[in-house]
């Protein structure tokens, strides 16, 4: 028995130690594909199948998501081709038949997307402060019509919890453990002020993990029992399966006055071993626009081996903030001679390379290629666990 206990402890420590060894193999340069990717407001990305990805736009009130074909070099992970194939599903969950259509809801501001199963996606709406599950519809107009499933999940939050344009920007899905992850972009109102160049604060955020397996099991039981729940009641029930952690961002890197300044977590990505990638993004835009920059930092965290932090708890000097490890950082900008400014908002796992390395795909929001100056940039980073 003693030997078994020793072996169990050794195995546990081995797993903990092995969970810290992701490293960047290669950071590839960003690329734009203007001939095959029309100007857009692309803000989130998820892998669907093969080389097809779902991409959401924070300005579209008609397309639920766009189908993108993304091809990478199998040896280096460098982007070879990116193409927008159009959209097949409308924001109300119906099939796009190519005819003019205008939905009843507007202002979704979809920011992130994940594939939760072979038949459903989850999308964040910053405009409605919600996380919502949608069915994946067949792409053929001749396929049988699929109506909304009655047990699709939705979680709404009061807009008063967030500062303007600072709520749900991120989603990640751990398909192995069936966990759905999200985090607010900036500090919640109840927790203080958002970071600015003037106050120099470090945003204190609440990382949230939903036990998707238990949520779906509960919803299936309700459906079998013919229990009809309101959206508000559904959100309350979903919160029973939610666990939270404390995350602290870096402080602003500048103290200059900005016309537009955004500092927050713009995306999450779940790794195969249960760890997460966190994309911290700082965008600084002066009134004259020249001198604008966007600084991105990619961190690795391991919340499953960390102390939890309940939503009702207040931040203090004793708060168990998640330990984070910097994997990569890069800076783009706008000057008289250079127009590389890229506000990266989307991130997901790409393919594995021939040597077993993992590709991370990132996309930026060009604000519809603002003023003809910005571009829809894409980027890949190759990581490996050794």
PLM region descriptions:
Residues 20-386:
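Sequence/structural signature of beta-propeller domains
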């Amino acid at each position: 028995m003693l030997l078994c206990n020793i072996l169990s402890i050794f195995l546990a420590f081995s797993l903990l130690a092995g969970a810290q060894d992701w490293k960047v193999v290669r950071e590839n340069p960003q690329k734009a594909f203007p001939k095959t990717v029309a100007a857009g407001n692309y803000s989130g990305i998820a892998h669907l199948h093969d080389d097809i990805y779902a991409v959401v736009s924070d300005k579209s009130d008609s397309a639920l998501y766009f189908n993108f074909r993304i091809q990478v070099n199998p040896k280096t992970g460098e982007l070879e081709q990116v193409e927008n194939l159009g959209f097949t599903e409308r924001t109300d969950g119906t099939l796009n038949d190519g005819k003019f259509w205008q939905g009843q809801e507007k202002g979704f501001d979809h920011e992130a997307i994940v594939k939760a199963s072979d038949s459903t996606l989850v999308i964040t709406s910053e405009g409605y402060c919600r996380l919502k599950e949608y069915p994946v519809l067949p792409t053929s107009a001749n396929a049988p019509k699929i109506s909304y499933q009655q047990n699709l999940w939705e979680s709404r939050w009061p807009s008063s919890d967030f500062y303007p344009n600072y709520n749900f920007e991120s989603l990640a899905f751990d398909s192995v453990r069936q966990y759905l992850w999200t985090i607010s972009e900036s500090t919640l109102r109840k927790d203080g002020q958002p970071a600015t160049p003037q106050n120099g604060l470090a945003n204190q955020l609440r990382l949230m993990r939903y036990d998707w397996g238990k949520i779906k099991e509960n919803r299936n039981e309700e459906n079998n029992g013919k229990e009809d729940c309101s959206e508000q009641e559904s959100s309350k029930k979903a919160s029973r399966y939610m666990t939270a952690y404390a995350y602290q961002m870096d402080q602003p890197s500048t103290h200059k006055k900005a016309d537009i300044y955004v500092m927050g977590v713009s995306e999450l990505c779940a790794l195969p071993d249960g760890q997460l990638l966190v994309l911290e993004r700082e965008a600084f835009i002066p009134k004259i626009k020249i001198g604008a920059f966007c600084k991105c930092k990619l961190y690795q965290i391991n919340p499953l081996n960390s102390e939890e932090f309940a939503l009702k708890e207040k931040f203090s000097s004793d708060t168990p903030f998640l330990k984070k490890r910097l994997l990569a950082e890069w800076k783009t900008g706008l000057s008289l001679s250079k127009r590389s400014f890229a506000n990266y908002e989307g991130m997901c796992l790409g393919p594995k390379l021939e040597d077993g390395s993992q590709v991370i795909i990132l996309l930026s929001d060009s604000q519809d290629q603002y003023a003809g100056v910005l571009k829809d940039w894409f980027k890949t980073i190759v990581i490996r666990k050794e």
